[in-house]
């Protein structure tokens, strides 16, 4: 487990949210609703950034900060999904990274 998942685990403990539980339809849908909500907020900021790029050919510091915040929220709720169900997300991420790196072609 990496530092991010440890932080989320501490948050879930403090908020008396479930950790390392068996999957249930109810909890899966709840966790997915958190992800959906945060992805929508990120999408809204991306749309704002695209509009700003069309108007000024650059993205303001304010919008960049909002994008970073929303991206971090997506990561947080994804980590919460992993913590809730006891997924070894760090190992899985490492495997995905290794797989992606193996797809690189020289030259």
Residue ranges and their predicted role:
Residues 1-107:
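Flexible "arm" and connector segments at domain edges
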């Amino acid at each position: 487990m990496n530092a991010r998942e440890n932080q989320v685990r501490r948050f879930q403990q403090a908020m008396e949210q479930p950790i390392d539980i068996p999957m249930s339809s109810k909890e899966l849908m709840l966790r997915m609703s958190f992800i959906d909500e945060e992805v929508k907020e990120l999408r809204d900021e991306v749309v704002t950034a695209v509009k700003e790029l069309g108007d000024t050919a650059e993205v303001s510091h304010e919008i960049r900060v909002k994008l970073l915040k929303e991206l971090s929220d997506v990561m947080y709720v994804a980590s919460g999904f992993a913590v809730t169900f006891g997924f070894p997300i760090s190992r899985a991420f490492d495997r995905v990274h290794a797989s992606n790196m193996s797809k690189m072609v020289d030259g």
